[in-house]
Amino acid sequence: MSEVTQGPRSSVFTTMRFSKERGLFLIEHHIARMIEHATQLRIDATAISMDSIVQLLRQNPPEMVEGLLRIEYTHSLQLRISYRPFSIQNEQVDAVTLPSPIWPARIAGTKHGAWDAYIQARQHAEQKGADLALMVHEYSIVDGDRCSPLILDEDGVIWVSDSNTSVDSITFKAIHDWLLDAGFHIQHGRLNERLVARCVEAVAVGSGVGVLKIDSIDGEPIGDGSSRLFDCCNSCLERLYNGSENWDKVWS
C-alpha cells in the first residue's frame, strides 16, 4: 500500500472482491472507474488494463482463498496490488460522523492518493466502538469511510448523496435497477439531518462491506427497526455474487 501522506495526484486506486477460484468481481467496472479517475487526476492511464493487472496478479497470487484486492496505479505509471481479508460483511452496525475532507473540484469524488482522512476516519470509528464513519459536509452526509450511505424515507424513496465529494459506488450502480424493480424510488439529493433523523432505514453499500444496516449514528437510534432495504440489497448482492458473468478468472 502506498504512503498515505502522498498528495492526491500521486495515485489512483480501487478495491474489489476476489476469489482464488472465481477470480475478480466486477473488474471491468473497476478498471473503467480507475481510468476515469486517473484522467481526472491527470495521471496517464495507458497502463491501466485487464492484461496488465492480470499479469501482475498471476505473478503475485493471494495466499487467502477470498477477500479484498486493492489495485493502485501511481503517477509514475506503476501498478501495485495488495490483498486483505474481509473485516465486516452484511451486518448491523453503529456509525459515527466526522467532517469530510474537501478537495478542489478536479480531485473531489475520485479514489486518489491522499486517502489518509478516510483511513483515519475508520480508525476513529473503531476507537469509539463503532463500525463505520460517515463523512459530513455542510450538515449533510456525503460519504462513508469505505462505502456509500443510502437513506430510505417514509415514502419508499432511497436517497443518495448528490455531493461532488461523494465517490460513485460501483456496488450501488450494480444493484440500482433491481432496487427499482423491487418498488423503491431513487433520488439524489442532500442527506441532511432532518432526512436522516426521520428516515425509515439507513444502509451503506460497498465492495469491501457488501451492505451494512446502520442502526445508530453518534449514539442516536436510526430508522424504525425495519430491514426491507437491507434485505433487498442483500438479496441483490447475492444474485450478483452467484452470477458467473460478474467474475473474471485469474488464477484457475
Where are these regions (language model features)?
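Helix-start/capping segments and mature chain N-termini
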Residues: 1-58, 74-252
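Short secondary-structure junctions
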Residues: 60-67, 182
